[in-house]
Amino acid sequence: MNSLLMITACLAEIGTVWAKEGYLVNKSTGCKYGCFWLGKNENCDKECKAKNQGGSYGYCYSFACWCEGLPDSTPTYPLPNKSCSKK
């Protein structure tokens, strides 16, 4: 029983360490999600934790939302073959 708990704890830790991070990106425009309040930012945190993003924490860094703990399926900036187009 103790071995099973130890293995589970190790796997959870590995998943946390290897989690993806990066700037949130708008898939239709290819642009980063912008923000103005640097550091702890309620809007960035909310966007990162949204069900379609799946992140664990978000904050404003260099005037864009940076997310930590993202699944590999969530795209981050820059998108391959798509540059930011502000239309």
UniProtKB/Swiss-Prot annotation:
Its main location: secreted. GO terms for biological process: defense response. Residues 1-19 form the signal peptide. GO terms for molecular function: sodium channel inhibitor activity; toxin activity. The keyword Secreted applies. The keyword Lipoprotein does not apply. One of its GO terms (cellular component) is extracellular region. Expressed by the venom gland. InterPro entries: LCN-type_CS_alpha_beta_dom (IPR044062), Scorpion_toxin-like (IPR003614), Scorpion_toxin-like_sf (IPR036574), Scorpion_toxinL (IPR018218), Scorpion_toxinL/defensin (IPR002061). It is found in: Secreted. Residues 20-85 form the LCN-type CS-alpha/beta domain. Keywords: Disulfide bond, Ion channel impairing toxin, Neurotoxin, Secreted, Signal, Toxin, Voltage-gated sodium channel impairing toxin. Disulfide bonds join 31-84, 35-60, 44-65, 48-67. Residues 86-87 form a propeptide. Beta toxins bind voltage-independently at site-4 of sodium channels (Nav) and shift the voltage of activation toward more negative potentials thereby affecting sodium channel activation and promoting spontaneous and repetitive firing. Has the structural arrangement of an alpha-helix connected to antiparallel beta-sheets by disulfide bonds (CS-alpha/beta). Belongs to the long (4 C-C) scorpion toxin superfamily. Sodium channel inhibitor family. Beta subfamily. This is Toxin Cll5b. The lineage of its organism: Eukaryota, Metazoa, Ecdysozoa, Arthropoda, Chelicerata.
